[in-house]
Curated annotation (Swiss-Prot):
Gene from which the chain derives: xseA
Assigned GO CC terms: cytoplasm; exodeoxyribonuclease VII complex
EC number assigned by the record: 3.1.11.6
Reaction(s) the record says it catalyses: Exonucleolytic cleavage in either 5'- to 3'- or 3'- to 5'-direction to yield nucleoside 5'-phosphates
Subcellular location: Cytoplasm
Protein name, per record: Exodeoxyribonuclease 7 large subunit
């Protein structure tokens, strides 16, 4: 037995690691080698915890990495991430020791390629705004009852189906003219401009005719420029400067309905009205048929009542004129007497009214200061009580006395020492900030 042990070479034995220590060593090595790190890929399994922290994976065809984005970094995002979206991340690479997983702690996130495109978008927006293309004074109101609606979009897009469905449901009697155009790609701006110019021609020709129509085409007095949602690259055609200048030349009100509610393009700022979606654009220009029928019936009733009242007044005047022609001298004497009595009553009423107003003003002048003081005193007392209650309920007072609020990596409060084994990552919220902690040895009471 002793010989067997003697055959072993202690010097050649490998270092035996504790699991947590090995995880920390690997994490330190990764941070020293790769941090800071930037990575591009698709979002997968995105979720936002009640604490505000975000957890997801970033992946491509070659692999995936688990990611954690804490609340402070998540609050700086200007968009809502979705699964399958291509993004660029920047952060610190390490190991989540509790699971031994490779993890990227994300410090910033943006859509892939968005940085340069967004800067280009902001520069163009600022220049066109300085030229006055976005001024509210040039925005026009929509016609209350359009005679014809022009639509510019892709003929195979879901946006067209949404628009046509909404218009047929709400205003099936209004004709719609579709001018197809490309809505994505390098050729899309020129295609959109050509489609708009064709509708502008129809609108101008219709404005010069008696009924607003052109031979073979209905009148056009409203235009919808629509497209479904997509990435900033997908919607980039609607940020074209030539398209923006074409939009502001529209002879009739133009509504843009590009993307989703959170998407904004240069076309939105140039249009007379911006709708959050293509369906909303159609609804803005189309009051339901029931609303217009009700309005027409109401106007018809008012017109009939007005005509009847006019006829009644004229008949009454005719009757009175006939009576006066019978005895004009007696009627004149009665009118003079009646006028004299009315003038006397009016003078007397005015004197009484002025006297009452004078007495009332004197009374109010005496009562107003005292009433105001009492009201101000009551409000000041109520405000002081509310301020004291707020101060007593302020959790920061507890933190300022040296206490701290501990949360785990998931943002859940830690209230028991046994729930935080060695190596657990915690965050301590203090009165003036927070600390990231790692448990070395819990001590139970």
């Amino acid at each position: 037995m002793s010989g067997a042990f003697g055959a072993m070479n202690p010097a050649a034995a490998p270092l035996v690691w504790e699991v947590g220590a090995l995880c920390r060593a690997v994490s330190d090595a990764l941070q020293a080698r790769f941090n800071p790190v930037a990575v591009r890929g698709e979002i997968s399994g995105f979720s936002r915890a009640a604490s505000g922290h975000c957890y997801f994976s970033i992946k491509d065809a070659g692999g995936q990495i688990r990611c954690a984005m804490f609340r402070r970094a998540a609050q700086l995002m200007d968009f809502s991430p979705r699964d399958g979206e291509l993004v660029e991340l920047r952060g610190r690479l390490g190991v989540y020791e509790q699971r031994g997983d490779l993890q990227l702690v994300v410090e910033s996130m943006q859509r892939a390629g968005q940085g340069a495109l967004f800067e280009q978008f902001l520069r163009l927006k600022a220049r066109l705004e300085a030229e006055g293309l976005f001024d509210a004074a040039r925005k026009r109101s929509l016609p209350p009852l359009p005679r014809g609606i022009g639509v510019v979009t892709s003929p195979g897009a879901a946006a067209l189906h949404d628009v046509i469905t909404a218009l047929r449901r709400r205003v099936p009697h209004i004709p719609v003219v579709l001018v197809p155009a490309l809505v994505q790609g390098v050729q899309a701006p020129a295609s959109l401009i050509d489609a708009l110019q064709r509708l502008y021609g129809l609108a101008r020709e219709g404005a010069g005719s008696v009924d607003g129509s052109v031979a073979g085409a209905p009148p056009i007095d409203t235009i919808l420029l629509v497209r479904g949602g997509g990435s900033i690259e997908d919607l980039w055609a609607f940020n074209d400067e030539r398209l923006a200048r074409t939009i502001v030349q529209s002879p009739v009100p133009l509504i843009s309905g590009v993307g989703h509610e959170t998407d904004f393009t240069i076309a939105d700022f140039c249009a007379d009205l911006r709708a959050p979606t293509p369906t909303a654009a159609a609804e803005l220009v189309s009051q339901p048929r029931e609303v217009w029928m009700g309005a027409l019936q109401l106007m018809q009733g008012r017109l009939e009542d007005g005509v009847q009242r006019l006829l009644d007044r004229q008949q009454q005047r005719l009757d009175l004129a006939a009576q006066r022609l019978g005895r004009p001298s007696e009627q004149l004497a009665r009118s003079r007497l009646q006028l004299s009595r009315q003038a006397q009553r009016l003078r007397h009423a005015m004197q009484l009214r002025l006297q009452r107003m004078d007495h009332a003003g004197q009374g109010l002048q005496a009562q107003l200061p005292a009433g105001m003081r009492r009201g101000l005193d009551r409000r000041a007392d109520h405000l002081a009580r509310m301020e004291l209650r707020l101060q007593l309920l302020d959790p920061r007072l507890v933190l300022q006395r040296g206490y701290a609020l501990l949360t785990d990596a998931e943002g859940h409060p830690v209230t028991e020492a046994r729930s935080a084994p060695p190596g657990t990552a915690l965050q301590a919220q203090l009165a003036d900030g927070s600390l990231d902690l790692v448990v070395t040895q819990p001590r139970l009471l």
